[in-house]
Design a protein with these regions (language model features):
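C-terminal non-catalytic regions of proteins with extracellular/luminal or membrane-system context
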Residues: 1-254
């Protein structure tokens, strides 16, 4: 879904400004195509070809699967077939948040000549406001399942060292992208609930366990106070898991 013979895709305005999309949903014609396909009674998978978030609330409950392929290049069709037929186990993770409603994102005016945004966007905005996304930052499905355990964190010099165990509890070999997030105390200044500070890909056979390790430098946790970058003392929250919404949590004093 997403392209015709014209240089611009049908998801763009007839007179696009800088390539901005009119909205975050699929074009009406493509939603109609999904409706027609699901009416056949056969299993339907929707492969989204796009470079940013696409809202799926209107039709997600009617299809069997959704795959975000981004712009996969000339071998994208081959890659898609290999995933769908089980030759390759999917292991990708979303680099953005897919919201349930466009209003959950920062305000956007495609005709504005200038605009000022604050610090809150994506998963940091939704977590700050207590809004559940449709698909969280870092989300991604697999033909395997994974279990996390033994999250540990300690201060080592000018860094926090983090380790977490991840086990393949499924029946197929698969990769998992383990993500590490840090949440600052937020007493001296308002901070995000948590922010990504590292990720690591691990390859696991069925039943195999691996330890993912991260070293998070104190410099990456500083905030700007006037003309200096400060490290706020206090209790830092440490998270590790398969997405920003599915994490184990511990804490460490810095």
């Amino acid at each position: 879904l997403g392209a015709d013979k014209k240089p611009r895709g049908p998801s763009l305005s007839p007179t696009p400004i800088g390539g901005d999309r009119v909205g975050l949903t699929l074009p009406e014609a493509q939603v109609a195509l999904i409706r027609a396909a699901t009416a056949s009674g056969k299993p339907v998978l929707v492969a989204i070809v796009a470079g940013s978030a696409v809202l799926v609330e209107e039709w997600r409950g009617d299809v069997n699967a959704i795959l975000m392929s981004f712009y996969a290049g000339m071998e994208g069709g081959t890659a898609l077939a290999e995933v769908l037929f089980g030759d390759v186990c999917p292991s990708g993770k979303l680099p953005f948040t897919v919201a349930r409603d466009a209003a959950h994102y920062p305000f956007f005016d495609r005709d504005a000549e200038e605009i000022t945004y604050d610090l809150w966007h994506g998963y940091t905005k939704l977590e700050r406001e207590g809004i559940a996304p449709r698909y969280a930052f870092g989300h991604g499905l697999s033909y395997a399942t994974f279990a996390y355990s033994a999250l540990n964190a300690r201060v080592a010099g000018e860094a926090i060292e983090v380790s977490v165990a991840v086990r393949n509890t499924g029946d197929v070999a698969a990769d998992e992208v383990v993500q590490c997030y840090i949440g600052a105390p937020g007493v001296e200044a308002e901070r995000a609930v948590k922010q990504l500070r590292g990720f690591a890909r691990v390859s696991l056979a069925p039943g195999e366990t691996a330890i993912a390790r991260f070293t998070v430098a104190h410099d990456t946790m500083r905030w700007r106070a006037g003309r200096e970058w400060r490290l706020e003392p206090g209790t830092y929250r440490v998270y590790a898991g398969g997405s920003s919404a599915a994490c184990l949590q511990t804490s460490v004093e810095v």
